[in-house]
Amino acid sequence: GAGIPAFFTATGVGTLIAEGKELREFNGKEYILEHALTADVGLVKAYKADKAGNLIFRKTAQNFNPVCATAAKICIAEVEEIVEIGELDPDDIHLPGIYVQRIILNATPEKRIEQLTLKVEA
């Protein structure tokens, strides 16, 4: 994964969480070292990709999909459309292809939404 491998946090200091972890003091306050989580595989759902793996997400899919992809050793992206390299506007790309190892085309994805369910009266 990419990003910060570890960070110091005050959360958990003085609790069971802190046992066995590195403890340091900064400006008179204690912090514990937390190592980042790295996933083996990150599965993301994107609207569109180019053949280089650059991805465009729609709406709230922009929230956690890029983070999931960058935190994983391998990212597999399911996309609705694959276009040629250069067809995506660079300003529209949410995740660079450097983080994507596989692209799977699903042009007609099942749209899972909540459905109204009513109790049948006997």
Model-derived features: where do they sit?
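Conserved alpha/beta enzyme-core scaffold
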Residues: G1-A122
